[in-house]
A protein has these predicted regions:
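ATP/NTP phosphate-donor binding region
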Residues: 1-62, 78, 101-118, 128-135
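A residue-level signal for conserved active-site and pocket-lining positions in enzyme catalytic cores
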Residues: 11, 64, 89, 141
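Short glycine-rich anion-binding loops that position phosphate/pyrophosphate groups of nucleotides
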Residues: 13, 68-71, 91
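Short glycine/serine/threonine-rich phosphate/pyrophosphate-binding segments
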Residues: 17, 70-75
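Glycine-rich beta-strand-to-loop/alpha-helix junction loops that act as flexible
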Residues: 40, 66-69
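Glycine-rich nucleotide phosphate-binding loop and flanking beta-alpha elements
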Residues: 43-44, 70-72, 149, 162
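Gly/Ser-rich helix-loop-strand patches that form or flank binding pockets
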Residues: 74-90
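Catalytic core of DAGKc-family lipid kinases
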Residues: 91-168
Length: 168
């Protein structure tokens, strides 16, 4: 995989994650890779942006998340659907979605550059209600209703199939 543009996403409010993001950014910059960081992470020669949504029009070769599942899901929701994400558990609680630890980053970057990897493609789930589309989800969507006195009617579409049914 040719790495030209990579964004590094750290866990909000975690100094451990922010410091790890700086380390990873420096490693990538030393390999002449263009790096984007998300504020407050700032690294010389990297391009800092205020938020992930500022990058959704840029074709990124890779996103690296440093945090827990929440950090990974935030990147997943805000980046283009074809952007691969390497997830590193740094300061996260469980890290169910994490692929590696920080100790493995050199090997992971080297493997990516040498194209000795496989991509696990995930389907995004998208929900809409009354014409308003919500951010994509990775594996589930929680539906709740305001008025509990009536049975709600749901319409679920998957590819060319549609199911419309009253459910509670």
């Amino acid at each position: 995989m040719k790495l030209n543009k990579v964004v590094i996403v750290s866990k909000f409010g975690s100094k451990i994650s922010e410091n790890a993001a700086k380390q990873v950014a420096k490693k990538l910059l030393s390999k002449k890779i263009n790096v984007y960081t998300i504020a407050p992470v700032e690294v010389d020669n990297a391009k800092q942006v205020e938020s992930l949504d500022k990058l959704n029009k840029i074709k990124l070769d890779l996103a690296i998340t440093l945090g827990g599942d929440g950090t990974t899901l935030r990147a997943f929701r805000n980046l283009r659907s074809e952007t691969p994400i390497l997830t590193i558990n740094v300061g996260g609680n469980r890290g169910i979605l994490s692929e590696i630890t920080l100790d493995d980053i050199d090997y992971a970057i080297s493997s990516i550059i040498k194209n000795k990897i496989w991509l696990d493609k995930r389907t995004r789930v998208v929900a809409s209600c009354n014409g308003k589309e919500f951010a994509p989800a990775l594996n589930e969507i929680y539906v709740n209703r305001k008025n509990l006195t009536k049975t709600a009617e749901f319409e679920i579409k998957f590819q060319s199939d549609t199911v419309k049914q009253k459910m509670d």
